[in-house]
């Protein structure tokens, strides 16, 4: 019988997959601001998925990639917003 924690992890993984699809849909809008929101949401979703994969399967490099995404994602968003502002 599956442990409740394993069921919760797989449920979170499935919901993050749905959120990732929604974030890609938001990012493909014609508005630049909505694109930034969508990419930021996708960044958070992928980082969370990678941390969850690290926790579930013990794959170490997933954690490192997730930390890099979390640290570099806002930097890219701020840089792109400054370029748009002019």
Swiss-Prot record:
Top-rank lineage group of the source organism: Archaea
Membrane topology reported for the UniProt record: Multi-pass membrane protein
InterPro entries: MrpF/PhaF-like
Compartments, as annotated in UniProt: Cell membrane
GO molecular function, one term: monoatomic ion transmembrane transporter activity
Transmembrane intervals: 4-24, 34-54, 64-84
Signal peptide: none
Keyword Amino-acid biosynthesis recorded: no
Cellular compartments per GO CC: plasma membrane
UniProt KW keywords: Cell membrane, Membrane, Transmembrane, Transmembrane helix
Family membership noted in the UniProt record: To M.jannaschii MJ1223.
Protein name, entry field: Uncharacterized protein MTH_1250
Species this chain originates from: Methanothermobacter thermautotrophicus (strain ATCC 29096 / DSM 1053 / JCM 10044 / NBRC 100330 / Delta H) (Methanobacterium thermoautotrophicum)
High-level lineage: Archaea, Methanobacteriati, Methanobacteriota, Methanomada group, Methanobacteria
